[in-house]
Amino acid sequence: MAKILVLYYSMYGHIETMAHAVAEGAKKVDGAEVIIKRVPETMPPEIFAKAGGKTQNAPVATPQELADYDAIIFGTPTRFGNMSGQMRTFLDQTGGLWASGSLYGKLGSVFSSTGTGGGQEQTITSTWTTLAHHGMVIVPIGYAAQELFDVSQVRGGTPYGATTIAGGDGSRQPSQEELSIARYQGEYVAGLAVKLNG
């Protein structure tokens, strides 16, 4: 049995929706145990509420528990071409795991969301830097998801990982094509984890 963690931060629900699609794909793989968790909110509650933040139901992860998983699929919105501050704060607490080599050889993959598309690939690849310092095996999705070739509509999705475009005001929700790419990412990573650890 390979243990897969889908770990995310979502303020307005776009990444939360994508996380559930990633988990849905991962659960298709026999021998994969899939868990969804989120990183803690760092914003004061009154500011979070005033900004229109969406309450999340997923349990909150601790940095130490990352060592318990064979693969971790990280989801984060873009903040100026980087991961969100909440995800950064969480990962900055993994120094003990780094010192002990606890994440070395584990699979790591990333999905993201942006307002208008700017920064989606940069967010994924800049997150990879942290995973590389931990010695994780970085798993992009390539172009195996056929939806990546569809240019008939506005759509997120990259060979680096699934993405969604929320629109400048956040009103656009993940499309079926974007969710399909997210499901593919989950299934692909889980399949590799089972082959390596199952």
From Swiss-Prot:
Molecular-function GO terms, alphabetical: flavin adenine dinucleotide binding; FMN binding; NAD binding; NAD(P)H dehydrogenase (quinone) activity; NADH:ubiquinone reductase (non-electrogenic) activity; NADP binding; NADPH dehydrogenase (quinone) activity
Binding locations of FMN: 10-15, 78-80, 113-118, 133
PROSITE patterns referenced in this protein's UniProt entry, alphabetically: FLAVODOXIN_LIKE (PS50902)
Catalytic activity line of the entry: a quinone + NADH + H(+) = a quinol + NAD(+); a quinone + NADPH + H(+) = a quinol + NADP(+)
Family annotation (Pfam families): FMN_red
Family annotation (InterPro entries): Flavodoxin/NO_synth, Flavoprotein-like_sf, Flavoprotein_WrbA-like, FMN_Rdtase-like_dom, NQO
A cellular component annotation (GO) from this entry: membrane
Domain (Flavodoxin-like): residue spans on this chain: 4-189
Name of the top EC class for this enzyme: oxidoreductase
Cofactor: FMN
Keywords associated with the record: Flavoprotein, FMN, NAD, NADP, Nucleotide-binding, Oxidoreductase
PANTHER family referenced in this protein's UniProt entry, alphabetically: FLAVODOXIN-RELATED PROTEIN WRBA-RELATED, FLAVOPROTEIN-LIKE PROTEIN YCP4-RELATED
Family: Belongs to the WrbA family.
Stated name of the protein: NAD(P)H dehydrogenase (quinone)
Organism: Salmonella typhimurium (strain LT2 / SGSC1412 / ATCC 700720)
